């Protein structure tokens, strides 16, 4: 086991603060509408230029092990806030730095770190309650566009396209972000249910111009097992042909003579048919087949339910107005399922979303809700260069998270104003002892920092602007983008309540841990082995 180096009390905390300052000073340059750029070196390819705080934080690793521990703890604040709310990473970093910096001054002056932490936690609780009171619901597309614009570093086109996507697929709909091929951002909306499985054979193609399959008014056969024998399928094929309708088969797999027979029938024009694999795997596949069954008003033909392919009736099959299939996806438009059954299924999945603890499961369940309830929107990000594309895509993803957070918990005035208004509640708040009251004062000072930094990045004097904003009430604040004072909501400068709340809670949590740190342990740096000594007579040549 390698030897360790141990640092205690003030020495440990000051080394940690040095790391916090290096990371936070780099990240906070990006805050606000006039945030500066940070250039990140890449081991290959062009450097990346970004105004995204979390991207900057992720790049920072320090040589000194103790300083690096401080930097990594603040990095945790940024990434945790990003995970929970999708934005607010820079605000969280600025708050964490301010709390740690002010807190360590008090600890060095002899205050009890545990009491300071209790005071900070008490103050955070009060500020969070104030933010909830300030919060207004975010329902109209104008407010959604404004939130998206602010989060995407004041890029209006991004805010507009996100609002448009939410309008189209609803608040529950799935919105994904992809790299586009043009210079402009584009919005593609997929109506109906789409899943990632394409045709099993190119011989099913009946639309040469799109290289896809289009089935009008088809029946849908759903089966949870592999189909290899044509004997199993014959009864269904005969009944469908007699009805003069097309057929889509969705099964675990279709191969062998079954697939060959379907292809031959399709090519000869005896029966318009197509086969695709069922989406998902394992239990998720069963659930998704059940979703498709409810959407199309059919039944999953499963031996577990005592149903077999040979005994299938037309009433067991699902129906849809139109189904489009290409090499990679299948889209079911206007399924014949009853609205009540679909609604009940959506409610059932929503209950599962509430109960699940896994982020991955939650995401997959939300996708299923969207496919049943609304649709899927794809935002294709356009840019001139690869570097710009990556940076823009990251901003669109941030903005999308922020708008979802706004819809969830509402909005507060942006530009650091909400925290200044919540500061009023801390003026009369006192702790159980002097040191706890010091903790409350530390937080009261720290929550001014986001506004100060936004103003500093815009090249103005922070103290002057702060005093003017504190004189005002309600949504009165400072627009750093235009250097004007006014109503922040009217000017469209909004922050999701969830983002501001998460940033404050995460910053205070990690800062509290740092203030109460008494020892730090790190591996000793390895001594570099010297090179070979110079050979005889080499000195003169050096």
Curated annotation (Swiss-Prot):
Gene3D superfamilies: GroEL, GroEL-like equatorial domain, TCP-1-like chaperonin intermediate domain. The keyword ATP-binding applies. InterPro entries: Chaperonin_Cpn60_CS (IPR018370), Cpn60/GroEL (IPR001844), Cpn60/GroEL/TCP-1 (IPR002423), GroEL-like_apical_dom_sf (IPR027409), GROEL-like_equatorial_sf (IPR027413), TCP-1-like_intermed_sf (IPR027410). ATP binds at residues 30-33, 51, 87-91, 415, 495. It is found in: Cytoplasm. Keywords: ATP-binding, Chaperone, Cytoplasm, Isomerase, Nucleotide-binding. One of its GO terms (biological process) is protein refolding. Pfam families: Cpn60_TCP1 (PF00118). Its EC number is 5.6.1.7. CDD domains: GroEL. GO terms for molecular function: ATP binding; ATP-dependent protein folding chaperone; isomerase activity; unfolded protein binding. It catalyses: ATP + H2O + a folded polypeptide = ADP + phosphate + an unfolded polypeptide. Belongs to the chaperonin (HSP60) family. Together with its co-chaperonin GroES, plays an essential role in assisting protein folding. The GroEL-GroES system forms a nano-cage that allows encapsulation of the non-native substrate proteins and provides a physical environment optimized to promote and accelerate protein folding. Forms a cylinder of 14 subunits composed of two heptameric rings stacked back-to-back. Interacts with the co-chaperonin GroES. This is Chaperonin GroEL 2. It comes from Methylococcus capsulatus (strain ATCC 33009 / NCIMB 11132 / Bath).
């Amino acid at each position: 086991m390698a030897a360790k180096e141990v640092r205690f009390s003030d020495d440990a905390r000051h080394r940690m603060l040095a790391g916090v300052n290096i990371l936070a000073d780099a990240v906070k340059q990006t805050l606000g509408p006039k945030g500066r750029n940070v250039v990140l070196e890449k081991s290959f390819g062009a450097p990346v230029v970004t105004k995204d705080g979390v991207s900057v934080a992720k790049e920072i690793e320090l040589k000194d092990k103790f300083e690096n521990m401080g930097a990594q703890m603040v990095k945790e604040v940024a990434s945790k806030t990003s995970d929970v709310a999708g934005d607010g990473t820079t605000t969280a970093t600025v708050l964490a730095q301010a709390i740690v910096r002010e807190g360590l001054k008090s600890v060095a002056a002899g205050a009890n770190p545990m009491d300071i932490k209790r005071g900070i936690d008490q103050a955070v609780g009060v500020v969070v309650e104030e933010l909830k009171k300030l919060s207004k619901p975010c329902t109209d597309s104008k407010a959604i566009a404004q939130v998206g614009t602010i989060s995407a570093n004041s890029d209006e086109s991004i805010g507009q396209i996100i609002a448009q996507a939410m309008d189209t697929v609803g608040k529950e709909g799935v919105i994904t972000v992809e790299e586009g091929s043009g210079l402009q951002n584009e919005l593609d909306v997929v109506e109906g249910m789409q899943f990632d499985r394409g045709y099993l054979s190119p011989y099913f193609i009946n639309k040469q111009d799109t290289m896809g399959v289009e089935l009008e008014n088809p029946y849908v056969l759903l089966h949870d097992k592999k189909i290899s024998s044509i004997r199993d399928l014959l009864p269904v094929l005969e009944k469908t042909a007699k009805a003069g309708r097309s057929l889509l088969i969705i099964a675990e797999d279709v191969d062998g003579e079954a697939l060959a027979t379907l292809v031959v029938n399709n090519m000869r024009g005896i029966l318009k048919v197509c086969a695709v694999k069922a989406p998902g795997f394992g239990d998720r596949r069963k659930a998704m087949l059940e979703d498709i069954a409810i959407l199309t008003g059919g039944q999953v033909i499963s031996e577990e339910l005592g149903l077999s392919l040979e005994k299938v009736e037309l009433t067991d099959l699902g129906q849809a107005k139109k189904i489009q299939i290409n090499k990679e996806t299948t889209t079911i438009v206007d399924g014949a399922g009853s609205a009540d059954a679909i609604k009940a299924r959506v409610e059932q999945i929503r209950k599962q979303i509430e109960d699940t603890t896994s982020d991955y499961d939650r995401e997959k369940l939300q996708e299923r809700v969207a496919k049943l309830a609304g649709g899927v929107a794809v935002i294709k990000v356009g840019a001139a260069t690869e570097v710009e594309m990556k940076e823009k895509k990251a901003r669109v993803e941030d903005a999308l998270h922020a708008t979802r957070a706004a819809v969830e918990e509402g909005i507060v005035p942006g530009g650091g104003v909400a925290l200044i208004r919540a500061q009023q509640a801390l003026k009369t708040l006192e702790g159980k002892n002097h040191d706890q009251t010091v903790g409350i004062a530390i937080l009261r000072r720290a929550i001014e920092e986001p506004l100060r930094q936004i103003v500093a990045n815009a090249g103005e004097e922070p103290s002057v602007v702060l005093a003017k904003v504190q004189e005002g009430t309600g949504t009165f604040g400072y627009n750093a983008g235009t250097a004007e004072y006014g109503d922040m909501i009217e000017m469209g400068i909004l922050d999701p309540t969830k983002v501001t709340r998460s940033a404050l809670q995460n910053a205070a949590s990690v800062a509290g841990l740092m203030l109460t740190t008494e020892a730090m342990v790190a591996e000793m740096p390895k001594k570099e082995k010297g090179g070979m000594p110079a050979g005889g007579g080499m000195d003169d040549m050096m």
